[in-house]
A protein has these predicted regions:
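Acyl-donor binding region in acyl/amide transferases
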Residues: 63-154, 264-320
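A conserved beta-strand-loop-helix scaffold within acyl/acetyltransferase catalytic domains
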Residues: 2-63, 111-113, 118, 130-133, ...
Length: 320
């Protein structure tokens, strides 16, 4: 009978290794603690793979808990070993987290198992394919003992994202954009839109824009406490990550805003918002260009603009 090949050791979240992945940092652990989650950190070691991992847990009721791993673990095995590795890791973690754990959800930051061309599934513009969920589940379970890995109904944080390479010059970055995008960035400047770095005192202004955006785009808004937790956590973990709060103004009017985080060499567009008024001022374009320039001055190599729908699908939570 095969035995578990993965060893895990609990550790303090403050001692998580430096990483470019915001959601695997001491800062993010503190954010989630303030929002009511429990956090757990572990070192892990398997055959040829070691690292650490931040896990979030929450009570679901009736003595049942769920665990969530956002963009982790960072270090993983060869793609053919994804399933057995996750099975072993999960079984080892349950012994420490508790047997009342209903499931562990992983949003994996690893390379897709479906890179390259093929005939199975849908062919995407970048040449990669992703079969239907049932076939993805079958592939992930190859080599596992229990066949207990399930494909989540929706990919959340990493399956499809827009990531910009910041190693290019500003001229090269602008040159790689669609003509309409370049035009709107410059139009915002000509119309007098100014982007400034702000502070927590103007967070209520941003939240008002955020509520307008959620109503306009029909998504569920996070509570105000979510945003204030970012700043409270930053004060507790000043050396872990950075938070930058950008507002686009035209005169006295605030037209758009963004919260940008920096972890390691990666900047992440965490939240954005824009006014339902004066949309012809193109303030969101000015915000994104300011965020790109800020990330470059901070030495970042990539700018993660966040998750997007994998294809035009009005039902997908990241469409639009």
């Amino acid at each position: 009978m095969e035995t578990n090949r993965t060893n895990v050791e609990p550790k303090d979240a403050w001692s998580l290794y430096p990483t470019d992945i915001l959601f695997q940092t001491p800062f993010w652990s503190e954010v989630k603690l303030q929002l009511g989650w429990k956090t757990h950190a572990f070192d892990y070691r398997a055959s040829g793979v070691d690292g650490d991992i931040l896990i979030l847990t929450r009570h679901l009721g009736k003595g049942i808990h769920a665990a969530y791993v956002q963009q982790g673990p960072e270090n993983g095995p060869h793609l053919e070993e994804y399933g057995p590795f996750l099975e072993d890791l999960s079984e080892a973690l349950v012994k420490h987290i508790g047997k009342d754990l209903a499931f562990i959800r992983y949003d994996l930051p690893w390379p897709s198992q479906y890179g390259g061309n093929g005939t199975e599934g849908k062919l995407y513009p970048d040449g990669s394919i992703r079969p239907e969920p049932r076939l993805q589940e079958v592939r992930m379970n190859f080599g596992t003992r229990s066949w207990n890995l399930r494909k989540a109904a929706v990919d959340m944080t990493v399956a499809d994202a827009v990531v910009i390479d910041l190693a290019q010059s500003e001229e090269e970055l602008l040159g790689g954009m669609k003509p309409k995008t370049r035009y709107n960035i410059r139009l915002a400047g000509r119309r007098g839109v100014e982007v400034v770095c702000s502070d927590i005192l103007e967070l209520p202004v941003f939240y008002d824009l955020y509520r307008q955006t959620s109503e306009r785009n029909r998504f569920d808004a996070c509570s105000y406490s979510y945003f204030s937790a970012l700043y409270s956590a930053l004060a507790s973990t000043p050396d872990s990550s950075e938070v930058h709060f950008l507002l686009a103004r035209h005169g006295r009017n605030v037209l758009a805003g963004a919260i940008i985080t920096i972890s390691g060499r990666t900047a992440t567009y965490l939240f954005g918002a824009s006014s339902s008024q004066s949309r012809n001022m193109m303030a969101p374009y000015a915000i994104q260009w300011a965020a790109i320039r800020l990330a470059r001055t901070k030495g970042c190599l990539t700018y993660d603009m966040g998750a997007v729908a994998p294809a035009p699908n009005l039902e997908h939570p990241f469409f639009g």
